[in-house]
Amino acid sequence: TGTDGMAYTSTIFPIIIAAWLASKIEPWLKRWIPAVIHSMFAPLVEIFVVSSLVLVVFGPLVMILSGFITNGINSIIDYNYIVAGLVIGGLYQTLVIFGLHWAVIPVIAAQLSNGSESSRINAIVSVTMIAQGAGALAIWVKSKNPRIKQIAGPATISAMCGVTEPAMYGLNLKYGRAFITASIGGAVGGLVTGLLNVNMWGFTGAFIGFPSFINKHSGEIDASFTGFWIASLVTLVVGFLLTYLFGFKDSDLETERKVEKVRLGRREPVAN
C-alpha cells in the first residue's frame, strides 16, 4: 500500500493532528449517539475514525514533508558546507522535537555504508548534541535548586554521549530560552564544522564519537579530527555561556511548563 514502510510513529505531528481531530469529533458523537450507549460506542468510533485518518492521510503527508526536509538538507550541503553547518546546526534539534530527523538518518546511514564516503551531515549533527549538553551543563552550574541539579547532571553526561532527549525534554525545552541559546551554540558549532571542512566516518556523535572522525581510509588523525575538537569546544563554550547568561534563571522554575494528562477527546484533566 501507499503507507508501507512509512515510519512516522516517532514524530509528534500525527499525535497533534489526532488530538485536534478527536476534539472536533467527540462533540459531534455526543449529539448523534444516544446517551444510553454513548459511553460504549463513542470511544470506539472516535478511535477508529481518528486512527484511520492519521494512518492513511496525515501520516503519509508527514513523510512527504520529511522527504522535502531531507532534499533541502542535501541541497544546502551541496551548495555550501559553511552555510549548511550554520543552518543545520541551529535547526537540527528542532527536527528532533517533531520526529522529522528520522528522514535524515537513512541518508546518513547510506553515506556511511558506502565504503568511499564520509558524512558531512553527521559531522554537523554531532555538534548539535554537544550544544544541548552545554545548555544542560549551564543550568546545572547556575541553578541552586537541588531537584534541577539532579536532573541536569545526568542529562549533561547523556547529551555529551550523543543522547539529547533528557537534556531537551527534561530541561532546555521546559525553560524555553535554554533550548534557543543551546541551539545558537549548535549553529555556531555547525558553522565552524563547515569552515574547517570536517568529515565523519562513523555514526556515533558528540564527544563519545571522537573515533568516528579518524580517517578510516588512511587510519591517520587528519584535519577532520582536529576540526571536530575545535568545533565541539566552540559549541560547548558558546552554548554554555549563552545559556548561563541568557537562557536560564532559577525564577523560571516558578513558571515552568506543566503537561496535564487528558483522555482522548476530553477536555478535562484525568485525576491521577
PLM feature segments, named:
Residues I105, A109-G186:
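Helix-loop-helix junctions within the multi-pass membrane cores of secondary transporters/permeases
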Residues G89-H101, L112-E117, S158-C161, T193:
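Transmembrane alpha-helix interface/packing and boundary motifs in multi-pass membrane proteins
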Residues I16-P34, F58-S66, A103-I105, L242, ...:
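Juxtamembrane interface elements at the cytosolic ends of transmembrane helices
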Residues E26-G99:
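Core mid-bundle transmembrane helix pairs that form the ion/substrate translocation pathway
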Residues P146, P154, P166-N272:
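Transmembrane alpha-helical segments and their short flanking loops
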Residues G5-I17, N71-I73, Y79-Y81, N122-S126:
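Structural signature of hydrophobic alpha-helical transmembrane segments
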Residues I12-K24, E46-V56, G89-T94, A131-A138, ...:
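Hydrophobic core segments of alpha-helical transmembrane domains in multi-pass membrane transport
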Residues T1-I12, F213-E220:
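Interfacial loop/helix-cap signal at membrane boundaries in integral membrane proteins
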